[in-house]
C-alpha cells in the first residue's frame, strides 16, 4: 500500500497450457519484484471465481492480467466497467462480471483494468512460446511504469 491506495494485480490462466499462463506469470513477476511487491498485492488462479468479488472489494486499484489471442499488439490495457453477463459455466466468468458482483454485493467499485497479453499457442504440457515470453517482458515493463504512475498521481492528489 502506498499513500493509502491498495493495489492488486490478479493474474489468471493455466500455466500448463503454454501461453494461457501469461497472466499468472506476470503476477509471479510482480510478486518477486522487490520494489513493487512492497506496494502491490498479488493473486493468481487458473480462472476467475465468484469469490474474487470479495477479494477485489478490498482494493482501490485492480489490474487483471490474462492471455489473449485476438489482439494485434504484444499487450493491451483497457479500463473495464461492471457488466452482468450470464455464462453457462463459471469457467467463462469475466473480470467485468467480477466487478459487477463486487459492486452489487459489497457496494464497492475499485478502478479496474484488464491487461491482455498476446499469446499464440494453448497446447497442454508444452512450455510458453518464445514470442509470448517477449510479450510478457513488454507487458511487465509497461505495468511497472503504469503502477508507479498511478501512485504518483495519488501522491499529487489527482486520485487514481
Please identify what each model-predicted range represents:
Residues 1-119, 126-138, 143-160:
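N-terminal catalytic or cofactor-binding beta/alpha core of small enzyme domains
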Amino acid at each position: 500500500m502506498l499513500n493509502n491506495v491498495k493495489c492488486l494485480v490478479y493474474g489468471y490462466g493455466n500455466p500448463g497450457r503454454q501461453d494461457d499462463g501469461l497472466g499468472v506469470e506476470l503476477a509471479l513477476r510482480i510478486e518477486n519484484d522487490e520494489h513493487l511487491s512492497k506496494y502491490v498485492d498479488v493473486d493468481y488462479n487458473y480462472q476467475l471465481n465468484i469469490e474474487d468479488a470479495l477479494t477485489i472489494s478490498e482494493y482501490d486499484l485492480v489490474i487483471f492480467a490474462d492471455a489473449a489471442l485476438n489482439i494485434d499488439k504484444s499487450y493491451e490495457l483497457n479500463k473495464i466497467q461492471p457488466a452482468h453477463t450470464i455464462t453457462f459455466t463459471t469457467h467463462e466468468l469475466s473480470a467485468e462480471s467480477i466487478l459487477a458482483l463486487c459492486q452489487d454485493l459489497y457496494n464497492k467499485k475499485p478502478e479496474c483494468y484488464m491487461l491482455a497479453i498476446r499469446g499464440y499457442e494453448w497446447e497442454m504440457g508444452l512450455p510458453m512460446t518464445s514470442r509470448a515470453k517477449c510479450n510478457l517482458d513488454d507487458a511487465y515493463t509497461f505495468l511497472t511504469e503504469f503502477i508507479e504512475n498511478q501512485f504518483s498521481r495519488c501522491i499529487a492528489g489527482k486520485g487514481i
